[in-house]
Each structure stands twice: as C-alpha cells, then as structure tokens.
Amino acid sequence: MVSSNFYKNLGPRKLTAIIDFLHDIIEPPKIHEDIAIHDIKILQEASPNDISFLSNPKYSEFLKTTKAAACIVPKNFTGEANPNTVLIHAENSYFAYGKLIDFFYTPIKSYPAKIMKSAIVADSATIGKNCYIGHNVVIEDDVIIGDNSIIEAGSFIGRGVTIGRNARIEQHVSINYTIIGDEVVILAGAKIGQDGFGFSTEKGVHHKIFHIGIVKIGNNVEIGSNITIDRGSLQDTIIEDLCRIDNLVQIGHGVKIGKGSIIVAQAGIAGSSTIGKYCALGGQVGIAGHLNIGDGTQVAAQGGVAQNIEAGKIVGGSPAVPIMDWHRQSIIMKQLVKTSNSKLKK
C-alpha cells in the first residue's frame, strides 16, 4: 500500500483522462462509463475505483477475479478477464504502468533552490541555477554542478568534479575524479572515483600503482546504492549513456560499459574489461579482467565469465557457456546425483 507519509496521490482521475494521457502508447478502448479512478493497485487488491496492470503472464489468472475498474494489459493479451474490467492494451504494459505512476503520484519531499547553512561549498565551485545543496554536503574547489541539480545530505563532491544538469545525488555519496553528464541519478551510499585495485608485486611486497585516470559517466544514467566505481589506472573508467546499474555492484578500474546496458545487484567487473552496448548482466555475475563482452550479450545470474563473448550471445554458469549448454550440464548433473545416490543406497 502506498504511504501518504511519502507520496501524494493526485487522484481521482477520470478514466478518459488516463486514456488521453497514455494515448500514444496504448490502444484506446471503448468505454461505456467515464468513472473516477482513485488509485493504482495490483490485481489482487484493486477495488472498483482502481486501475491495475498486467505485465507478467504468471499473474493473468487474477484478471478473472479482480475488481479493478480497468487494467493495462499486453497488446497481444487474449485471456479471460472480469467482464466489468476495462482492458487497455499497450505495446509495453509495464512501461505504461510506469507512466501512470507519474500521472497519479508525486513525492511529498521537495527540494527548494537553496544551499543549506551546514553545507561547505568552496568559493571556486560553480553551482548552477535552482540547485539544492543539502545539510553537511562538502563541495571542494573547482567543482561544477549544473542547473536544477540536487545534492542530498552528507554527500562529498571532490575537487574538480563536474556534474551536469538535472542530476540527483542522494545521501552520503562520495564522488572524486569524475565527470558526470546530464539527467544522472546516483542513489545513497555510492562511491565513485576512488583508486582501483592495482598493485605491482616486487620481492614479496605489493606496491600501490598510482591511478591517473578518471571516471566518465554519460547522460541519463542511474547508479544504485552502495555501488563502487574505481577510476582508471591509465585509461578512464567509462559508463555510457542510458545505463542502469543496480545496488552493490563493483566496477573495476578502466572498465567500459556500453550504452544502454543493465547490470543487476552484486555483479562485479574486473579491471580493463569492456561491456558492449545494451548488454544485461544478471545478479552476482562476475566478469574477469581484460575481456571483451560483445553488444547485446546476456549473462544469467551468478554466471562467471572468463573469456571473451561474441555479440548477441546468451550465456550462463561458471565458467559461463552458451545458455543451452548450461541447461544440459545442469540436467546431466542432476542425473549423476540421482545415479550416485541410488548406488550408495545399494
């Protein structure tokens, strides 16, 4: 249930207003009554004054019994539904749901154009128009922050860092040696631009390699909580436009992540590896160093990648192999365990 402590409901909204708002991404349905829609809820909890959505076919059974006045469904949905529920077909029902959230809700917390008194901002820093700088933020010399950006409480922005327009930096984020584009979101606790894990071993002693690269983050990127992104040793660490990186991900020095890639929680990418455009790495995936992962590659959760992967491949397992081979290996392993157990019983 949505808490009114944190989010303001902008409803009720007329069903026709909802259809008009989504008109470019849905097939407008025929409606017999223009009712008021009060809220968005899951199918199981929706009332006759609510709208719902279906994006995962696992939940299609609930459409038969839902009380929702309307439901956004995939374009090709032809299953059974409550006859009293208006079905709104969308090319991407989950995307339409996301747009609908924006139509119904807004955060109660606001960020006025203000620098809080407890913030420490260097005289040589440049703060754009309409920015919010929160309590106990530290902004060092020669930092540039673009217009309409938000830096929340306790964050540290190191000397020379550039942050573009419309950025949102949440609480207790640390950023050093980094250039960031526009429309970037960095969630709480992220650490960006620190030294990478680089040492040379001489006569049993591990000597630190001074890192002289930086981190470059493109436009419209989202970076999760407690992520760590190391700056390059010599080559820069680069995250291109439109990437989405989940919580607790480690990105090593000199890594390049291509445009539009998605990296799920607890994945780790070792130094100097290149991830192509529009790749997807599942949770806890590990990528060894100095590898090239081709555009459009998908790696299943907990996959361990130790060699280059051609573009468009889907792999899984550790060491990672083509996904069908991984499924076969899993089946064979189960059969071996059954055979072994039956022999032990004899």
From Swiss-Prot:
Enzyme Commission number(s): 2.3.1.191
GO molecular function: N-acyltransferase activity
UniProt pathway: Bacterial outer membrane biogenesis; LPS lipid A biosynthesis
Superkingdom of this protein's organism: Bacteria
GO cellular component: membrane
Subunit structure: Homotrimer.
Family of this protein: Belongs to the transferase hexapeptide repeat family. LpxD subfamily.
Listed HAMAP family: LpxD (MF_00523)
The protein's name in its UniProt record: UDP-3-O-acylglucosamine N-acyltransferase
Species the sequence originates in: Rickettsia felis (strain ATCC VR-1525 / URRWXCal2)
